[in-house]
Regions:
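A detector of single, family-specific signature residues
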Residues: 1-239
């Protein structure tokens, strides 16, 4: 991004994601403003239309050319910057392809485990694998509260031995990776799960802050995960 800011500082205004599919395709072919000006509007439109699957067309092509015309980026060592930008795009594309392969492998391994964890709202193959990897053998935990504590999602008690108000802090002990995975899943479940979304809304209606409510849903989700793994039965929302 630093290199791109030097040669085409206005570029970030053209795409919401500089390293999105369409932007990467554009930069891999035309890394500098002058390159974008040299190509015909028709050819540029075709590239954008194909890369974005029809989302961008001649309007975006004209906008890019307009920005490129008015750009005040540096004008020296162009060949060096062009090479560097192309190399960065190639490296990003390679890493993304490796991640896709890794995700496929994770999905395949998860299938061999025959785990019911992905039946829980918000937990897909990647989060499921992360959670299982951090928990290990569920028999290590005798009760759900132990799993909650292991994830560091239990409520921190203040010095007076009480917790009050609309904001409750979690202890953040235990596995940060497990906590993060469950938190992500809980955030999704707050709006997607038939039962947990109702619970989340009740907390909000009572004046709880969003993060406090998500934390409460995350603790509920720990209980659900514990039950699903212990009983080896799929999750069914209890409305």
């Amino acid at each position: 991004i630093t290199i791109l800011d030097q040669v085409f500082p206005e570029y970030s205004d053209l795409f919401s994601d500089t390293f999105g599919v369409t932007s990467k395709e554009l930069l891999s072919k035309y890394p500098l403003p002058e390159n974008m000006l040299e190509v015909s509007t028709k050819e540029l439109t075709s590239l954008l239309n194909k890369a974005s699957k029809g989302r961008f067309g001649i309007g975006k092509a004209q906008e890019i050319k307009e920005y490129a015309t008015k750009s005040f980026g540096i004008s020296f060592a162009k060949e060096t910057f062009s090479f560097q930008i192309k190399q960065i795009i190639n490296q990003i594309s390679f890493i993304e392809s490796q991640l896709k392969e890794l995700e496929k492998e994770i999905t395949n391994i998860l299938k061999t485990l025959n785990s019911e964890i992905t039946t829980i709202t918000g937990i897909g193959d990647i989060l499921g694998a992360s959670i299982l990897g951090e928990i290990g053998d569920i028999s290590r935990f005798e009760k759900a509260s132990q799993l909650v504590a292991f994830a560091g999602l239990d409520v921190a008690i203040n010095q007076s031995g009480e917790f009050t108000g609309t904001e409750m802090k979690i202890t953040k002990r235990g596995s940060p990776y497990l906590r993060r995975s469950i938190w992500i899943a809980a955030t999704i479940a707050c709006f997607k799960d038939p039962a947990l979304s109702v619970y989340y809304k009740k907390l909000i209606d009572r004046g709880k802050k969003h993060l406090t409510a998500v934390g409460a849903v995350a603790r509920k989700m720990c209980n659900i995960i514990f039950s699903v793994l212990k009983n080896k039965k799929p999750y069914t929302p209890n409305i």
